[in-house]
């Protein structure tokens, strides 16, 4: 009987580090729910000590997720571990993941310490984490460049201290697959208590072999793989979990292991991460790219028509990618829209039916026919904007001709007040943004503007993703409409609402801090 490989997802921690703007707590929760639906065993959802916002999002996810183990990262520092436990304690069960560097380079130049001191610190911090939970994971940062004898000493000590999972990261993506497999085999040969822990691997894609390294490690005995959906992450990214999962499934003949992932949810989860993180998936991306199951060669097309297995080692259906079909029109009622969402596997709690149906009717009136991908875009891109809005786009118009100069008029609801402004700009989008900024008075610098089509043909929805800089912080916004200028305006309004909410959160934190200080003085 094959053994299980635990899937540890770090999209919301290591993956998020690649984004130009941090995700909101609600966006993180949306991704966490998608990962839970896909069946990941463990999800690492943040680094609570890093900021109040990260603490809040970890706490929210820990309170909500029931079918996956929620994990938070902590350095081998007392405060890190204590704060992680504080954020996670609302969960029925949780994991603390603590780490320290073990390579000679990191020990000498970063930690300015010795291997013996590193081992002593690791043991102390694993024991401290065990005071909060019996599920403690310990990582040897830069294990790929750590001599295996040194690594074995650290691993043995961490297991004796109570770590149930030992993670071996190729932190800088330096190791070759045969080398990495050798490290795992070497640990099994050298560590006498290794049977008391699960060996995990965490690989990076700097040389394009993160997935290869993870699979080689599994073949050598690792039983947990860490990675991120779509391979997002620092520098060149993390190990792409969807690739590892499907490689294990397709090549079960030689891997002789399995995962508990619902692989029919892979495509939808990948799309959710792509849309929320504003990271388009390359067409030639393995497993989830738009061209992953496309056949253009005449010879290949002929072979596939005769027998799909001639050129397909897996099917689109195996990852949940079914043939896109016509579903709904403006004459469809709420029940029909709800039924189609149920057919696609969504529950009532996954989206707001009132918002979805209103948006559906507007879109159906414009384009006549609404497809599955339209519904998902309306449900889950617009969902990010369902929180109470201080700013709302009431009206806009743009005049432009053959010259570069355009004029925009905008009405914006600011709380209970409607304000209007007009402005010129270098094109219609710039004019809209100038007018909006005049109304709000916010000093924002546009640092990224992306336009992507959601759907097919001339009636496709246009999704605009923007990132702005505001007083040293970056904020992300998204807008969706059949008109690009309208999408752009909605994206900017979304950004401004995110800035406004961040300011309100800061005010609330200051108020709580002041109340705490006042209570101290009273005592």
From Swiss-Prot:
Propiece residues: 1-2
pH profile of the protein: Optimum pH is 8.5.
InterPro entries listed in its UniProt record: 2-IPM_HCS-like, 2-isopropylmalate_synth_dimer, AIPM/Hcit_synth_CS, Aldolase_TIM, LeuA/HCS_post-cat, LeuA_allosteric_dom_sf, LeuA_bact_synth, PYR_CT
Family annotation (NCBIfam families): leuA_bact (TIGR00973), PRK00915.1-1 (NF002084), PRK00915.1-3 (NF002086)
Positions of the Pyruvate carboxyltransferase domain: 5-267
Subcellular localization(s) per the UniProt record: Cytoplasm
Region Regulatory domain, residue ranges: 392-523
Source organism (scientific name): Salmonella typhimurium (strain LT2 / SGSC1412 / ATCC 700720)
Catalytic activity, reaction form: 3-methyl-2-oxobutanoate + acetyl-CoA + H2O = (2S)-2-isopropylmalate + CoA + H(+)
Residues at which Mn(2+) binds: 14, 202, 204, 238
Family: Belongs to the alpha-IPM synthase/homocitrate synthase family. LeuA type 1 subfamily.
Name the record gives this protein: 2-isopropylmalate synthase
Activity regulation behaviour: Inhibited by EDTA, mercuric salts and by leucine. Inhibition by leucine is non-competitive with respect to 3-methyl-2-oxobutanoate and competitive with respect to acetyl-CoA, and is more sensitive at pH 6.5 than pH 8.5.
Keyword NAD: no
Pathway the protein acts in: Amino-acid biosynthesis; L-leucine biosynthesis; L-leucine from 3-methyl-2-oxobutanoate: step 1/4
Subunit structure: Present in a monomer-homotetramer equilibrium.
GO MF annotations, alphabetized: 2-isopropylmalate synthase activity; acetyl-CoA C-acetyltransferase activity; manganese ion binding
Cofactor: Mn(2+)
Function: Catalyzes the condensation of the acetyl group of acetyl-CoA with 3-methyl-2-oxobutanoate (2-ketoisovalerate) to form 3-carboxy-3-hydroxy-4-methylpentanoate (2-isopropylmalate).
GO biological process entries: L-leucine biosynthetic process
Keywords: Amino-acid biosynthesis, Branched-chain amino acid biosynthesis, Cytoplasm, Leucine biosynthesis, Manganese, Metal-binding, Transferase
EC id: 2.3.3.13
């Amino acid at each position: 009987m094959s053994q299980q490989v635990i899937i540890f997802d770090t999209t919301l921690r290591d993956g998020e580090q690649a984004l130009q703007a941090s995700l909101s707590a609600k966006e993180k929760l949306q991704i966490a729910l998608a990962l839970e639906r896909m069946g990941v065993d463990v999800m690492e959802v943040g680094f609570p000590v890093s900021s109040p916002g990260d603490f809040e999002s970890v706490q929210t996810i820990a309170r909500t997720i029931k079918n996956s183990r929620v994990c938070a990262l902590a350095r081998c520092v007392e405060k890190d571990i204590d704060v992680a436990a504080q954020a996670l304690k609302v969960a029925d069960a949780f994991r603390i993941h603590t780490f320290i560097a073990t390579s000679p380079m990191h020990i000498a130049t970063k930690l300015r310490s010795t291997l013996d001191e590193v081992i002593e610190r690791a043991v102390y911090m694993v024991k401290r984490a065990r005071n909060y939970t019996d599920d403690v994971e310990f990582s040897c940062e830069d294990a790929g460049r750590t001599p295996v004898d040194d690594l074995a000493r650290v691993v043995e000590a961490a297991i004796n201290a109570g770590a149930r999972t030992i993670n071996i990261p190729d932190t800088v993506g330096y190791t070759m697959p045969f080398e990495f497999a050798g490290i795992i085999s070497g640990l099994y040969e050298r560590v006498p208590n290794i049977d008391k822990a699960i060996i995990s691997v965490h690989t990076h894609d700097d040389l394009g072999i993160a997935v290869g390294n993870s699979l080689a490690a599994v073949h050598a005995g690792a039983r947990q793989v860490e990675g991120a959906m779509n391979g997002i992450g620092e520098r060149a990214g993390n190990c792409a979990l969807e690739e590892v999962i499907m490689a294990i499934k397709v090549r079960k003949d030689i891997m002789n292991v399995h995962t508990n992932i619902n692989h029919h949810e892979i495509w939808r989860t990948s799309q959710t991460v792509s849309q929320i993180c504003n990271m388009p998936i390359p067409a030639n991306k393995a497993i989830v790219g738009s061209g992953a199951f496309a056949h253009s060669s005449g010879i290949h097309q002929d072979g596939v028509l005769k027998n799909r297995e001639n050129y397909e080692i897996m099917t689109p259906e195996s990852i949940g990618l079914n043939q896109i079909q016509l579903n709904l029109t403006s004459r469809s009622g709420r029940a029909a829209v709800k039924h189609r969402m149920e057919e696609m596997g969504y529950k009532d709690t996954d989206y707001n039916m009132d918002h979805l149906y209103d948006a559906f009717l507007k879109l159906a009136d414009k384009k006549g026919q609404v497809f599955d991908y339209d519904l998902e875009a309306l449900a889950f891109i617009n969902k990010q904007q369902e929180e109470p809005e201080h700013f709302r786009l009431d009206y806009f118009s743009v005049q432009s001709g053959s010259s570069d100069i355009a004029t925009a008029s905008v009405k914006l609801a600011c709380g209970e007040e409607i304000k209007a402004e007009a402005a010129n700009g270098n094109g219609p989008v710039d004019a809209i943004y100038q007018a909006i900024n005049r109304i709000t008075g916010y000093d924002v610098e546009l640092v990224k503007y992306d336009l992507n089509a959601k759907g097919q043909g001339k009636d496709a929805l246009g999704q605009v993703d923007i990132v702005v800089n505001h007083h040293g912080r970056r904020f992300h916004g998204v807008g969706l409409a059949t008109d690009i200028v309208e999408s752009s305006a909605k994206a900017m309004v979304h950004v401004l609402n995110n800035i406004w909410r961040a300011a309100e959160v800061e005010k609330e934190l200051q108020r709580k801090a002041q109340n705490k200080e006042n209570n101290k003085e009273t005592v």
